[in-house]
Structure formats: structure tokens, C-alpha cells
Amino acid sequence: MVRFLLFILFMSCQPKYDWLDTLPKPWNLNRREFSSYLPLFQKKYPNFSNRIKAFSLWQVGKPYQLFCLGEETGKDLDPIFRMDVSDCTVHILTSIASVQSKNWDEARSNIIKIHYKKDPNGISMPTYKSRWHFTSDRIQD
């Protein structure tokens, strides 16, 4: 009986993710539509861990394209932020940037902070040279 009650208590404390099934897929949305869902994620999942899990689950099934982020200029013309295609790294980066944002432009700004090294003045500028190219580069002591 105690196990059953603990199970019920545990399950009732878990966030519900079935709401995600009611949403259109993020890769089918334009920027304005995508922006309209970001505040809903913050309201529905106020806890950061639950929100990032929910957002990550929402992206499952997105078309796969390797090396799909760039600087929009210079050596790599791919977009800085995108939701139409993804690879493993982009999935994580867009999730982290999006769940901390209220709209597309803020998510784009956040991904620059996450995906690019800071210059000597502490500013992250999207250039090929300043991009974190390897996961191991992101590991700080």
C-alpha cells in the first residue's frame, strides 16, 4: 500500500508533457508563430529543467541536417538561429537559447551568447573564428 501511495505521489508531481502533442511542430512555424509559443512554455513549465525537457521533446522529429548553423556572412552563410533543421548540437543549443527567451530575436541573441566565445571586451560576436566548434571547447574548468 505504501509503495502504491508513493507511486501516485511521484506521478502526480511529474510535469505533464501531453500538452506538446497539441502544438504544431516548431519546424513548420514562421518566426512570429514560433515567438508566440515561447511565453507559453515559460508559463506551462516555470521550472527551467522541466521547460528545457519539454522544449527538447517538442523538437523531436525535426528534419536532420549536419552543421546547419553559421554566421550568415563570411565563411558560413547558414543562419545563426533556425528551427527548420537540426543536428545534435543544434538541438541542444536551440533548446537552451529558446527556453530563456520571449521571442525569436531574443533566442537568436541568446544563441550568440552560448555558441560564440567572448572577445577581450566580454562581447560575443558571431564570427567563424569565435565560434565554439567542438563540444569539448565548451567545457570550462
Regions found by a protein language model. Give the residues of each.
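Cysteine-nucleophile amide-bond enzymes
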Residues: 13-141
